[in-house]
């Protein structure tokens, strides 16, 4: 959904349409999980849809002096499901941390982050926890 935020500066209607497409049953699971990225749609990603929807709303209001509050409110149910799915996941070590959800600058790694490394070690990714902390602000 981050791509829709970038699009909002030029075409807020299309930005909302793009964000709404990702919230349809074609992409979002019934439990609220939203798609991750094209090479693995079922990977866990933090619930960034709420942030994206709010930013699109804010950008349109700043640029056009008006915004589509109906679109924002109609997205709320799906966004709440996505947040609930993420908040209720169990981390791999059962330490009540938000596990996974890598959303780095380029989202590219030289190895498969979902599997242990050849020496058996794993990589801890703080991305999910940092995204969830944003909801407390």
Regions found by a protein language model. Give the residues of each.
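Active-site acid/base region of carbohydrate-active enzymes
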Residues: 9-12, 22, 27-30, 44, ...
């Amino acid at each position: 959904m981050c791509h829709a935020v970038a699009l909002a500066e030029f075409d807020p209607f299309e930005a909302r349409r793009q964000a709404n497409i990702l919230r349809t049953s074609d992409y979002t699971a019934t439990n609220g999980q939203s798609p991750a990225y094209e090479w693995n749609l079922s990977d866990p990603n933090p619930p960034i849809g709420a942030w994206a929807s709010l930013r699109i709303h804010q950008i349109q209001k700043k640029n056009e002096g008006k915004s589509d509050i109906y679109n924002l409110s109609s997205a709320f149910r799906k966004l709440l499901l996505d947040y609930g799915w993420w908040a209720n996941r169990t981390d791999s070590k059962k330490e009540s941390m938000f596990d996974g959800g890598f959303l780095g600058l380029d989202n590219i790694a030289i190895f498969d982050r979902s599997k242990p490394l050849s020496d058996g070690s794993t990589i801890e990714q703080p991305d999910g926890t940092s995204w969830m902390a944003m909801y407390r602000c």
